[in-house]
Amino acid sequence: MLDLKFVRDHFAEAEQRLATRGGAVDLSAFTDLDARRRTLLGESESLKAEKNQVSALIGKTKDKSQVQGEIARMKDVSVRIKELDEELKQVEGDLRTLLMTLPNLPHEDCPVGTSEDDNKEVRRWGQVPEFDFEAQSHWDIGERLDILDFERAGKLAGARFAIYKGAGARLERALINFMLDLHTGEHKYVEILPPLMVNRDTMTGTGQLPKFESDLFHLDDPDFFLIPTAEVPVTNIHRDEILADGDLPVCYAAYTPCFRKEAGSHGRDTRGLIRMHQFNKVELVKFARPEESDQELLKLLDNAEEVLRRLKLPYRVVDLCTGDIGFSAARTFDIEVWLPGQQTFREISSCSNFRDFQARRAAIRFRREEKGKPELVHTLNGSGLAVGRTLVAILENYQQEDGSVVIPEALRPYMGGVEKISA
């Protein structure tokens, strides 16, 4: 959620930066509500001060007959104060609701643009493989090796689901364990295993609600949501808490299944594992001091990249433009892995700095000194990595002419020493 005071004091800047996300931004409703709030608050506080002053005078007067007029007037003042406070509560609620629908302000260094075409490539790593045969897509490879079954998954649940079988299931599990071991061992993240269902306050804290409720899988009774990413429960671990300055940055790594409707993806990626209703992901979440969050984002990005470097999968890093970053993000770097079967790079991780946007919604603060005033932390997260898409990249980049798939060396200890998957 945006800082009310910042929007008020830097209105033109806020409007201009929001406009770079694409489309016209009309903040007139905000100015109207904020002006009404300040008017109501001023009148209410003035009447309360007057009431206190007159009440003190009445209390000192022994002969109450001399102040009957003031007593009667104070009754009217009390009624008016109640009316003002009730309207103020309504206006503040409307103002908060409006702020909840506004996206984050893009970072000052975020490239300005309207779509993914305006994203800026930062760097590439690894060598794109060249085959002496026609590269196959992962769905063909997986079905031929009998390690992926989309047809039977469709029978069980419908489109955008998959069954992993045999070496396919083991490879998925190996990737999860490899990623968690890397992040918790070498990168020093603390492992978290959170709930897969959360309440409305939790979804609101990270920005999924109220704007994106239609994109979420919802349970009516009780009122729970299936998580679209571990970012949601893990960030909310410290909702309504004050962290100690000495504990920052706090770094968590969590493996969870994720659940998404993909309502806006009709007709896109209808085959394979790229866009699923249910998929596995290892998520990295950080809580940092405001002045250190930009640097922490680069560290998080490098931690995610290291997974691909260890697996020797070619990738590139892209700095997302203002028109392509997510609702809650101020700055986002995408990692895109090369997929020979599609002859293109595809997103495998998004690493974002949300600054204090989520922390303000979720009331996550820290205290620099024992008796210092609490400040909002900055929150960050990124995929480290999307497991299914990593499996896709392995199948396509390590495919052999005879139809087999070589297991990356880094994964072989997690595969019981298996070096190749063959039919």
Curated annotation (Swiss-Prot):
Sites where the protein binds L-serine: 229-231, 283, 383
Enzyme Commission (EC) number: 6.1.1.11
Pathway: Aminoacyl-tRNA biosynthesis; selenocysteinyl-tRNA(Sec) biosynthesis; L-seryl-tRNA(Sec) from L-serine and tRNA(Sec): step 1/1
A GO MF term: serine-tRNA ligase activity
PROSITE patterns: AA_TRNA_LIGASE_II (PS50862)
CC per GO annotation: cytoplasm
Chief location of this protein within or outside the cell: cytoplasm
Entries under SUPFAM superfamilies matching the protein: Class II aaRS and biotin synthetases, tRNA-binding arm
Catalytic activity: tRNA(Ser) + L-serine + ATP = L-seryl-tRNA(Ser) + AMP + diphosphate + H(+); tRNA(Sec) + L-serine + ATP = L-seryl-tRNA(Sec) + AMP + diphosphate + H(+)
Pfam families, per database record: Seryl_tRNA_N, tRNA-synt_2b
Principal EC category: ligase
Keyword tags: Aminoacyl-tRNA synthetase, ATP-binding, Cytoplasm, Ligase, Nucleotide-binding, Protein biosynthesis
Binding site for ATP: 260-262, 347-350
One Gene Ontology term from the biological process aspect of the record: selenocysteine biosynthetic process
Family in the record: Belongs to the class-II aminoacyl-tRNA synthetase family. Type-1 seryl-tRNA synthetase subfamily.
Domain text: Consists of two distinct domains, a catalytic core and a N-terminal extension that is involved in tRNA binding.
Subunit organization: Homodimer. The tRNA molecule binds across the dimer.
Function text: Catalyzes the attachment of serine to tRNA(Ser). Is also able to aminoacylate tRNA(Sec) with serine, to form the misacylated tRNA L-seryl-tRNA(Sec), which will be further converted into selenocysteinyl-tRNA(Sec).
Record-given protein name: Serine--tRNA ligase
Gene name linked to the record: serS
